Swiss-Prot record:
Protein's UniProt name: Cliotide T17
InterPro entries: Cyclotide (IPR005535), Cyclotide_bracelet_CS (IPR012323), Cyclotide_sf (IPR036146)
Organism: Clitoria ternatea
PROSITE patterns per record: CYCLOTIDE (PS51052), CYCLOTIDE_BRACELET (PS60008)
Entry keyword annotation includes Methyltransferase: no
Domain notes: The presence of a 'disulfide through disulfide knot' structurally defines this protein as a knottin.
Keywords of this entry: Disulfide bond, Knottin, Plant defense
Annotated disulfide bonds: 5-21, 9-23, 14-28
Tissue expression from the record: Expressed in root nodules but not in seed.
Covalent cross-link Cyclopeptide (Gly-Asn) as placed by the record, residue numbers: 1-31
Swiss-Prot/TrEMBL GO biological process terms: defense response
PTM annotation, UniProt: Contains 3 disulfide bonds. This is a cyclic peptide.
Family the entry assigns: Belongs to the cyclotide family. Bracelet subfamily.
The keyword Cell membrane is annotated on this UniProt entry: no
Length: 31
């Protein structure tokens, strides 16, 4: 929840989700 993964999740889920990233405020974050 604190480190940006450099990915947007406005239209599609976080591809970086496989690395532990999750969607928050339309941006993918790690932890």
């Amino acid at each position: 929840g604190t480190v940006p993964c450099g990915e947007s999740c406005v239209f599609i889920p976080c591809i970086t989700g496989i690395a532990g990233c999750s969607c928050k405020n339309k941006v993918c974050y790690l932890n």
